Amino acid sequence: KLKEAGIHTIDDLAQLKEGIKIQGLRQEALHDLKEQAKLQVKPKCPDGKPNYLLKKIIEGKGLTILPKQNQGDIWFDLEGVQNPVFGTQLEYLIGLCYKNESDDSCIYKAWWAHSPSEEKQAFENWVQWVENRLKRYPDLKIYHYGSYEKTAIRRLEQQYSTKETIIDQWLRYSLLVDLLPIVTGSIVLGEESYSIKKVEKLY
């Protein structure tokens, strides 16, 4: 849509005049894209951190949809690799962080897999670990970044026909919280993407 409107480079977008409308693109989205382009062409901060702007707080977007903090909250990540010959996916690492009850330090826990059978076992062990923690912290949330984790969980429970009822319940009650839309709804980042590797430069 931008190219159709004659905008071919990031500089074109950054210099776009106010009030211009582009067919098929919401004004809010165009404004965010323009602000992001302006930040990207601007020299980076001396400390190497990307430029960013805080968005206006709007109910139902950004930080306003962040759940209330719970002592049992979990930060969750999956790492997978695709077999180039068979085209199959293997989630070789299920990792998570949670708070130490005694001093609030972060504890990292991982389940590794090197084969489909180990992948199934790792998935089942992870689900059971979360279920055990839910008994102690029924209001906890599982935070992840992007849609990959939720999609992979669905694939694993369907592929191995295991833990379907539990996963369905998790999804029905929004146990998993995707932080990506919360981030994109809260800031405009002067980077080419909102990948976690780009966003973490702010910290």
Sequence positions of predicted segments:
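C-terminal extensions
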Residues: K1-Y98, S102-W112, E119-A122
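Conserved DEDDh/DEDDy metal-dependent 3′-5′ exonuclease domain
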Residues: Y98, Y108-Y203
